[in-house]
Amino acid sequence: MQSNRKAAIKFIFVTLLIDVIGWGIIIPVMPSLLKQIEHIDTGHASSLNGWLLFAFSATQFLFAPIIGNLSDKFGRRPILLMSLFGFGLDYILLSWAPTIEWIFLGRVIAGITGASFTTAAAYIADISDDKNRAQNFGMIGAAFGMGFIIGPVIGGLLGGFGPRVPFIAAAALCFLNFMWGYFILPESLSKDHRREFDWRRANPVGALLHLKKYPDLGYLLVATFLVYLAAHAIQSNWSFYTIEKFGWTPTQIGISLGVVGALVGVVQGLLTRVVNPWLGNHRSIYIGLILYTIGMFLFGIASAGWMMLVFLVPYCLGGIAGPALQATITSQVNVREQGELQGALTSLMSATSVIGPPVMTNLFAYSISPNSPIYMPGAPFFLGAILLLGSAVFAFIAFRHSEEKKKSLKVN
């Protein structure tokens, strides 16, 4: 049983890693690709990239709760394998996309199959207990970190043979992972813990509204929402910001993302396993959010390219907050509804991705345009810092309410 659990954890980690590699492959070359296809400047390319992210996220927002609910009915294994196969098909399509319309179509397909994160997170929740829950969820961040090391490097190296080659490689990885999972991945959700599929709970709004029955999740979900939203200041604009302000090349962007990946991997894969149990979830969340805020603000005032690499340190250290938030939220939901919860959380993340990229990229495009009263390419980072401070406030309110409830129960 223990060996099966370890094998399953390894598979889930590799699955998430491959997902992020596919994403990381695109980032360094996307500005150049969009400018080449559409013959536009950096600001307009940034805005177009925001709408591509919008297409991906809007689709994922709609399908994530459906995938989560299907995994609660049929189990995690078949849904996860289906998502992996679909991701492979998506990359094959993108490898031959001749126009921007085909890229948009590919992003829509990726939004549907990208819900593999939903099932993977539910799988982790199934096989975790209170002692290792935060550490196991830290693997998600570690996969992001390693993916951001490997993905941009693959994109840079294989891109030398043509812009489509990295997508073919990503498709091959997805299909290999599908075959591996088909033979070694056990089911994590026993039949007596499954429930019937309910369309009312399988829509993004319904899934979120259903979470109202858990008393303290409201404030924690708002805190999580603000963290996700703030992250798009970086996710949507890093390449365009560094090109505009420092004149970085795709190679330099790829190296910087490799540094991000290395730092995130260390924090999520190693540091959270030591620091989070020592600090506890509440203090990990507070300290992490403050570090996030500091790093985000410093990005906006950086005056030289090397400063961006230095300022990555406090920002990435803030990553201790993510697993602690995830662990706190999942601990308040019973095992029968973990799939639904993860679907709702993925929908929440996707909702911020529907809002965040257009807001952050258009704010960036405006702040560097002649129409802006002041040239301020760091404007999205300043907005992100404000959102992160708001997240810390909502987390504080949630924990204060939780403590008051515990005291009330003791008195009664």
Name the predicted role of every residue range:
Residues 106-146:
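Cytoplasmic helix-loop-helix junction between adjacent transmembrane helices
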Residues 63-75, 267-281:
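Helix-to-loop junctions at the C-terminal end of transmembrane segments
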Residues 159-172, 362-388:
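A membrane-interface helix-boundary motif in multi-pass transporters
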Residues 61-100:
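Conserved MFS/SLC helix-loop-helix module at the cytosolic interface between two early adjacent transmembrane helices
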Residues 29-46, 236-253:
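Short amphipathic helix-loop junctions that connect adjacent transmembrane helices
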